Amino acid sequence: MIERKEYMNLLEKWRDKKAIKVVTGIRRCGKSSLLRMFREKLLSDGVSEEQVQDLNFEDLDNEPFLNYKFLYAHVKQNLCPDKMNYLFFDEIQMVENFQKVIDSLFLLDNVDIYVTGSNAYLLSGEIATLLTGRYIEIKLFPFSFREFMQTQPAHTSRELAYRQYIELGSFPYIPQISQDREMVREYLSGLYNTIVLKDVVSRKKITDVMMLQSVVRFLTDNIGNISVIKRISDTMTSLGRKTTSHTIENYVSALTDSYIFYPVQRYDAKGKQLLKTGQKLYLADVGLRQVINGTKGGDLGHVLENIVYLELARRGGEIYVGKAGDAEIGTPCVMFY
């Protein structure tokens, strides 16, 4: 298993601090594995098994705990009263009213809480308000190229590895099946369908799945271009799929909530203000292009721009595209405060 050093260091930095550690990111980017590695580190540091509670809410064995009252009672009953307790909740957004559990447990002095989520619902609206000042978000992405290289045989050239990185993407499971391109495609296709059907269609109650798929293909085709909601709506209408800007806006919002796309706002560097129109959208992993739009090649410049965005996002800071005077800033840039 690849040690994701930067993320492990972040978790260690916030260990035992009075803040809920929220790990977010697209499905299968390694959130569960990261918490598993951190759990193992705690045990190697002398923390006892009794001090650790670990619940994955996608596991059928834990279905009774989807009821928040049962969950709270179970966790509370198993706390060590005179020691620090480490609580790991994987995909906790599946628990209705989960925020009540987290809020109540947070009031205790001897708990350190870690949660993961594959949907921005975890930190949306009233929930974000409730948890304001009580959490830190750790945004997890699929492997960086440096991490990807650690999965390759020692004799692999960087050039060959980078071609694979661009073509196949960097979800942590990909290196294990990279020799069989059909398996890679099936894996990515299954992952993509799960995200669209489970995290987008079901949660947002979208009825026109074909329209949603068309929007995803359009956004993927236009990685690196400024996306304007009205232009997307007009394009769909011109293709015989009449829709409204409001519908398209909801679809784009649902897609970014599922972390399959990340939005980047435009910024006027000279005027030092955000621009009100347009944004760029980048895929969470460039390998998804092959199952969304087929295996067509080309457009390497925008693929590399997407990879630049992901690397900047891993390193933190506020990321913008935009302009400086009349000059367009096409590549993502990062601003630290």
In which residue ranges do the predicted regions lie?
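Pre-Walker A adenine-sensing motif
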Residues: 2-16
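Conserved lysine of the Walker
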Residues: 31
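Short glycine-rich substrate-engagement loop in P-loop NTPases that contacts/grips substrate
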Residues: 53-85
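Conserved catalytic/switch belt of AAA+ P-loop NTPases
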Residues: 99-115, 119-120, 128-130
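Interdomain motor-coupling "hinge/lid" segment immediately C-terminal to the ATP-binding subdomain
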Residues: 118-120, 125-226
